[in-house]
């Protein structure tokens, strides 16, 4: 064990014998002096024995080391002696060589001097030197000509020999030897090209080459078919020798693509037995698989045939294949994507076209392991022309469809939209519908718009964008945006317009239809005859006859009866509003608002997605996993754009417009509905035309809500002239004191105005569920910017004038409120300044805090002002309906033919009652209607005097206008304060009251 330990110690690389011996001796000395007791003596004895053994081992090892060292020393001495002796022998030889080289350099130097001196002598202009040079030059020319002649004679001899043995040579079938001989003949002909006698041989040489090629054709094709690599190598060498290497590869391409050509041509017979639309797509995928099998096989085989440029040969093989089949590709794709028995109105199968195209892209990507430049960022037209040819030959048939993509896509999308539009049409029933079927259809259509049509429409639009990315790679943004995207939302708007016309037809509330998708106003001839029937609509009860108990209200004016004389009034035909139609119209308005909001998000996301798509595919430094795919798309885009500067410039302009749209700052939002709409319209949009169409649809939806609210009032006011002429005037003529009798005509008047006011007072209850729904807010700016166009121009003008008047009044009220707020602010600021001046300078820090709080309060005050300027949703609608009611009331009064005095008082009381209700609703009275009331409440004598004064004033004005009077009438009567409209009302009332 000790021996093993010692071996380990001495065999280590860092063993130091001197240090180890000293350490061992020191340990032995220390252990001998430390024995004190019996136990320690025993241990020391054992230790001594071990030390003795160790010392013996050390002596043996040391002796061995010493002997080895002595031997090494002897060997080293011997080697040093031998090396030294050899070095001593070499030194004299080296000295002699150095001396020899020195002598040679001196001799060479002397020779150079001698030559330079001779050259100098020859450069002298002596006649002797010039003659010598001339003789030498002539001799050199003679020598060169003799050499050329000798070479020409040898080449001529070769040609003569070849001509004699050419037939025998070709009959030997040693094609390699023939090619070598032809190569020699070619060289000989190049030498003898200036000899006229051998020019005819040059023509024969081409014949010899053709003869050799014709003999090689059949065996070459057999060898290529059998993939005999050695034979093909020999044939390639032969064709290379005769400068016809291209012909060799042409034969190679023909042999390799013939089976694939047969497979390609076999599709016509297979397709005739199958009419499946996906037949060509599936077959093309299998065809590409066969091509890939061939390419992988040839990749390995060609590396043995031509190791240097086999990749280029393989690329040319693929190019030849697709060049051969391309004339039929476009027609087969067109046949595959065309619907059977297609007319010009039917769309093509765009999804099928995209599937075929994606299959081709996948095929080209699968070639990237062999041709890395297909997806390599370094692939450029200058570095890889073969790859560019590969892209061109494979994608060339699709270029036609990519240029027509927008045309195909819009037809397909319109077809998809039309396929989902039946959910918005009236459900036809075989047997007459019940009284509630109209309501059911109305409600279902509204729900389908929100829950199905709008989401599906955006899904269709998003899928169209994805197809645009996948098929055209954004090479023609402008055409797609204008031809497809804008047309999609235009079609959506037209479908919804048709739906609103359907809803109007269902409700029967109006016949003022809007222009539909056909570009004309709809004509519901047969249906309209049923609508005009007072008792039914499509076999259903008139909508205003449908009673809703929860909406029933009872109103009476002070001093009037209970309204028990309604049997002869307009209330006999219709007494209550059907609020289900109003609720549906409000839900429709919400849906259209949601459509507009979604559209704005869609427009923004579309711009971002296009820029993102272009950025990814153009960024060659992208390190994501999709880098290869992005570069592949970029290469396809380069091929599609090519060198067409118009397309490139058009794409650059489109991208610049998109970047401007994205980078444009969002307008500051405001709490005001009007300002919100204006800010939205100022934001540049990609699909501005679509935004206008949807905004127009929003304006139409708001008008539809207005129609559901105003219809009942129109219906009640429509019968007022008949009530006045048939009931009021007759009853009051038979009654000496009509003002105290509320049972006859007065009861009729009470019934109509009471129902109108009941309707107006019910509107806030119906609007209450929508008071917090911003999507039901009336957008005044939208309605003014996008006026409606129905089949009734008078109704359109009435509605637009109503909105303009409402806008003016609202602006005036807002300005007055702002003025009051500014005054309050100024007073508060003055008070604040006075307080700040009174504060001590030591409280400067506190003053700063106060100022900060003051600024925050000012900002909050501004927001509060905006909130105060904004009308509530319910108040908006109530105000519009109330203003319309007043205007309709005026129009109805104008239609009255005659009025007796009690009827005037009755009508004045009705107007006053309406004003009281409007005041309770927070709506100001119409000034012209107020003046009408004041004229009606005058007794006959007072009005007669007033009327005559008005006529007299008009005559004076006419005289002044004709220059017959020098001074204006100084009459300061109230009549001078009448406006033209009020004068017209006064004249009409005078005619009604038969004032002469």
Curated annotation (Swiss-Prot):
Name of this protein: Conserved oligomeric Golgi complex subunit 7
Protein family (similarity comment): Belongs to the COG7 family.
Subcellular location: Golgi apparatus membrane
GO cellular component: Golgi membrane; Golgi transport complex
Superkingdom assignment: Eukaryota
Subunit (UniProt): Component of the conserved oligomeric Golgi complex which is composed of eight different subunits and is required for normal Golgi morphology and localization.
Record's compositionally biased regions (Low complexity): 557-571, 849-858, 953-974
Membrane topology of this protein: Peripheral membrane protein
Alphabetical list of PANTHER family matching this protein: CONSERVED OLIGOMERIC GOLGI COMPLEX COMPONENT 7, CONSERVED OLIGOMERIC GOLGI COMPLEX SUBUNIT 7
GO term, biological process aspect, one: retrograde vesicle-mediated transport, Golgi to endoplasmic reticulum
Function comment: Required for normal Golgi function.
Keyword set includes Membrane: yes
